[in-house]
Regions:
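Carbohydrate-active catalytic/glycan-binding domains of CAZyme proteins
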Residues: 1-175
């Protein structure tokens, strides 16, 4: 109702037309592997780059009570990247960002990345989950920084954004 009241449906910036196209290369469908949430595609020195959430294994949901079971497709995931010379055929290059150390804000899962580039420095921002993940947790936003798109990526020791524990927004706009 709020979106209709605020006329978001009349704002062209919120809507676009998408066309599905089968991926070529080694990042397409693979049984038992989940690849989702790709970043914007950037081009560096004639090569295209994209980062994405990657996870393997069966998803069980919250009902098991086992803290080691994967509860969502993006649970126990990492951030990987792929490159392309033409933007159509992609080659998976490898891991970009993995979980943080045990007990840290990102020790369970890192997912839904986005890439930013500023003055020759590369910034990956992404959602993070801290274990245990038996019920909806407060998700944080982490960041890793690199001097080149291939990495190595240096993880920040603390999240750049955390949810308020009381569930209240700081302002009234769209709340």
């Amino acid at each position: 109702k709020r979106a209709l009241r605020n006329n978001y449906h009349k704002n062209a910036e919120w809507f676009g037309t998408f066309h599905n196209q089968e991926l070529k290369g080694d990042v397409g469908y693979e049984k038992g592997v989940i690849r989702r949430d790709p970043t914007m595609v950037i081009q560096v020195d004639g090569l295209y780059y994209a980062w994405y959430t990657k996870s393997t294994g069966k998803t069980y949901g919250f009902g098991t009570g086992d803290p080691e079971k994967k509860v969502f497709p993006w649970d126990k995931s990492e951030i990987w990247y792929a490159t392309s010379e033409d933007g159509w055929e992609w080659k998976e290059k490898g891991l970009a960002v993995t979980f943080g150390p045990k007990g840290e804000y990102d020790d369970r899962s890192v997912f839904t990345p986005e890439i930013f580039v500023h003055k020759g420095t590369y910034y990956l921002v992404y959602q993070c989950i801290k274990a245990p993940y038996l019920n909806r947790s407060f998700i944080t936003i982490g960041m890793s920084i690199a001097d080149k798109p291939e990495g190595p990526w240096e993880r920040l020791e603390a999240p750049i954004l955390e949810a308020a524990k009381d569930g209240k927004w700081l302002g009234e706009e769209d709340s």
